[in-house]
Amino acid sequence: MENLDIAKFGGTSVGNFDAMTSSYKVVVGNKNSRIVVISACSGVTNLLVELASGKCSDSKINEIIEKLRDIHEQIIIHLENQHELRNYIEGHLKEIKEQTLLANKGTNDQLTDSIVSHGELMSSYLFVALFKHYGTDAQWFDVRSVMRTDSKFSCAKPICEEIKVLAHDKLLPLINDKTIIITQGFIGSNTLGETTTLGRGGSDYTAALLGEALGVATITTTINWGKWIINIS
């Protein structure tokens, strides 16, 4: 699709309010950027992986949950609608804790994927709020509705034909000149609707898969303020 670019940001580029603001400026600086794919905030995935290991004591679980809360709170305090944003994050933290307690009874790759997926879901939601904070219309989109994969949890294989059909059906109609679509890297879902992940570093893969499905002009990946352009033919 002509005049449609995807911007992808890694964890350090959305790790705090200032980093998110810099990433926001990159997006709005390119009038063709209509879709943004982001990772979890820096450090969050590692914390979630630790919880998913099934080896955390109750005190360690509480300690990590508090770290996760603080990472996101340091972004929320700069935004509007703080009560609603905190409720959203707290909902995820509650689910993370419940899933962690299940992992302590016996973990597996499917449960791990469910736990680690919360990172991208939280960061992308706050990124939408940041866009609105700066007066730019943005819409949150759950990439799992189009990122169809097999059921090999922790390193799922994308089903490109289905991704293309789903992206054209569910994502493409949302794209316009006024709204930025914010979505998640790394995560997907199988045919049963169960959450899967593409493996560590999967956010770049997500952007490439969406780009291929939609035939975008370019994908811009920004990591630590360095920029690479990947052309999709």
Question: What does each model-found stretch correspond to?
Answer:
Residues 1-233:
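Nucleotide/pyrophosphate-binding catalytic subdomain
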